[in-house]
């Protein structure tokens, strides 16, 4: 990062951990500078003005200085917008933050990804049904990382067609496959309809099946990048299992 001092940069807080007696180490995702590590001195003290500002899921405007990897937070202000998520929506917010924290490189500018993060966080905090917003964000993230396959043309050079069936594999071009169910059962990767690929590409899901197939695609690609899994998803699965067992 070339600037020694950065002022009034919009960020989202991804995670924080205690630092020494009363400070916090914060991982934040900024619009112009990507993911940055910030040292918030005395932020854990009861009288600190930062206590109500350094929170996840809502945008903040922060200023920092320093040329080392760990910058010193100079100022932080809440930018307003929306309330913290509640209930199951909290896990959606944690899931998004964990994706960004684990998959982005430090100080790699991704302004479009920041805008996508702001959009999905607003949906998570405000909309009861934000599943489509999560799928759109996952696809934006995969594109920003350069690992999303081309959904305009298949591996033969032909256009992706709504009435065809395709096989999607990590690090490979999308390929058309036979609709025969016996043959499809032996295909590796994600077997999806062309319309679902078009919907994912355009970010507009026409049916529940299309949305479900989008989940299949993003889970396959993200799972390749994070074979160890995601803590937020594991916790949510445990809660769902508990709900099923106690229903």
UniProtKB/Swiss-Prot annotation:
Transmembrane segments in this chain: where? none
Q: Which domain of life is it from?
A: Bacteria
User: Which biological process, per GO, is one annotated for this protein?
Assistant: DNA recombination
One matching Pfam family, short form? Answer: RecO_C
A single GO cellular-component term from the record reads: bacterial nucleoid
Alphabetized UniProt keyword annotations: DNA damage, DNA recombination, DNA repair
The record ties this protein, via SUPFAM superfamilies, to: ArfGap/RecO-like zinc finger, Nucleic acid-binding proteins
Question: Which NCBIfam families does its entry note?
Answer: reco
Q: What does this protein do?
A: Involved in DNA repair and RecF pathway recombination. Involved in pilin antigenic variation.
The entry sums up its family as follows: Belongs to the RecO family.
Protein name per UniProt: DNA repair protein RecO
**To which species is this protein native?**
Neisseria gonorrhoeae (strain ATCC 700825 / FA 1090)
């Amino acid at each position: 990062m070339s600037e020694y001092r950065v002022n009034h940069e919009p960020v989202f807080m991804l995670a924080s951990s205690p630092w020494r007696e009363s400070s916090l180490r914060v991982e934040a995702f900024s619009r112009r500078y990507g993911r940055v590590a910030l040292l918030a001195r005395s932020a854990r003290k009861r009288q600190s003005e930062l206590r109500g500002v350094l929170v996840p899921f809502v945008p903040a405007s922060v200023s920092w200085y320093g040329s080392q990897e760990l910058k010193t937070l100079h100022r932080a202000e809440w930018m307003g917008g929306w309330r913290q998520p509640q209930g199951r929506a909290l896990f959606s917010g944690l899931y998004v933050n964990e994706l960004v924290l684990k998959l982005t490189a430090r100080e790699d500018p991704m302004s479009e990804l920041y805008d996508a993060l702001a959009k999905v966080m607003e949906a998570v905090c405000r909309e009861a049904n934000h599943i489509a917003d999560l799928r759109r964000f996952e696809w934006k993230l995969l594109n920003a990382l350069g690992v999303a396959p081309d959904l305009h043309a298949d591996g033969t050079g032909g256009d992706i067609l709504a009435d065809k069936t395709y096989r999607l594999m990590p690090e490979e071009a999308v390929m058309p496959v036979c609709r025969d169910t016996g043959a499809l059962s032996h295909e590796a990767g994600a077997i999806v309809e062309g319309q679902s690929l078009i919907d994912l590409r355009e970010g507009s899901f026409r049916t529940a099946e299309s949305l479900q197939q989008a989940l299949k695609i993003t889970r396959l690609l993200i799972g390749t990048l994070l074979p160890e899994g995601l803590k937020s998803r594991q916790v949510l699965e445990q809660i769902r299992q508990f709900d099923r067992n106690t229903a």
